[in-house]
């Protein structure tokens, strides 16, 4: 990235840990956009092996979800994970290292255009106190739940690298 002159992106990589990686999880090679996605995939594979979920997949959509007639971004959305629960229910999980306004816009559009889809928001960590509380409150309107990944990763310990 430095060669291309994206200094701001370089800073984001340092602060947020958004380093793409290629890793094997569940016997398959995956191209993750960030370390958070890699760790979450390990957690989902752990749940699958423990028979807590039926299956999971990453960036498995042949094309993005389009928001027809929308002129202002976002006009399309590609979710991170698809989790199939043991009863066959499919849940879309969106992972975010930092919860921002555009994330809520995507969630709101998904709820409007694809109301049959179940969404969950997975945050790298949920700050204590009021920081980001309004964004989380808004996101709760469009998601089944918001998950704090840092709590899960602490509980998993050495099982997730």
Locate each region found by the language model.
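Electrostatic, structured charged patches in enzyme active sites and in nucleic-acid/phosphate-binding
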Residues: 1-161
